Regions:
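N-terminal segment of the mature soluble domain
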Residues: 119-127
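Acidic/polar-rich alpha-helix caps and helix-coil junctions
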Residues: 1-109, 115, 131-217
Length: 217
């Protein structure tokens, strides 16, 4: 919306706060993102063309690489992961959850440290982790969103992405994503690949990789 009007245009209209946190709303671009997902799942050549068009519209019109005061959706930066572990800045559509209920439901699974008796806790072995994250020195998902687990018999890493910490930026805490910006890049890349446009597909994947701190050597 702010692509058509200055933010000041909405100040009077926004007295009730409706336009706040629009990346939680099922707004126009969230619908286009959902279209892209559904068309790709359908899988026919015609639907993949529609999926590509919808995903590209979201990427080109709704996304920005520059952080401004009124930015709706943008890439996570290096320093953002500490405040927004669920990557809220990249959400196109999501849920605002009750943190107490969520913590109670996930207490057995999402932990920052585990003992041998924490049988339900989610953790990743060292081998699995290093196989997934090809560059553990620079990949933000590795350096920012995993906690090393060195005690007990289950040595590995614990995921922090959905763990709500006291240090998280409160305006963007307690959020669970349903549609995120990187998915639009993946959908568009898959559609380009279906059209044998490997270069376009790789360009899109490279954008996501670079934004995660993964670079081609």
């Amino acid at each position: 919306v702010t692509g058509k009007h200055e933010w000041s245009h909405y100040e009077e209209l926004n007295e009730d706060g409706f336009y706040d946190y629009r990346n939680l709303h099922l707004n126009y671009y969230a619908v286009k993102a959902l279209q892209a997902r559904v068309y790709l799942w359908e899988g026919s050549a015609a639907s993949k063309e529609k999926a590509l068009a919808a995903a590209t519209e979201v990427i080109d019109d709704y996304f920005t690489n520059t952080a401004t005061a009124n930015t709706i959706v943008r890439w996570m930066g290096d320093t953002d992961f500490n405040n927004y572990p669920a990557m809220a800045l990249e959400h196109i559509f999501g849920l605002n959850i009750n943190s107490d209920k969520f913590s109670n439901l996930t207490a057995s699974y999402l932990k920052t440290a585990i003992a041998d008796t924490d049988y339900d806790a989610y953790y990743m072995t060292n081998d699995d982790t290093y196989a997934i994250y090809e560059n553990s020195n620079t990949d933000y998902r590795f350096t920012k969103l995993l906690q090393s687990q060195l005690n007990g018999t289950r040595v590995g890493f614990l995921p922090l992405k959905l763990h709500q910490t006291d240090g998280a930026q409160q305006l963007y805490s307690n959020r669970i994503p349903l549609l995120r910006m990187p998915e639009m890049y993946y959908i568009a890349a898959e559609c380009h690949l279906a059209n044998d446009d490997v270069e376009a597909a790789l360009d899109l994947l490279t954008v996501v990789r670079n934004q995660r701190g993964v670079y081609d050597e």
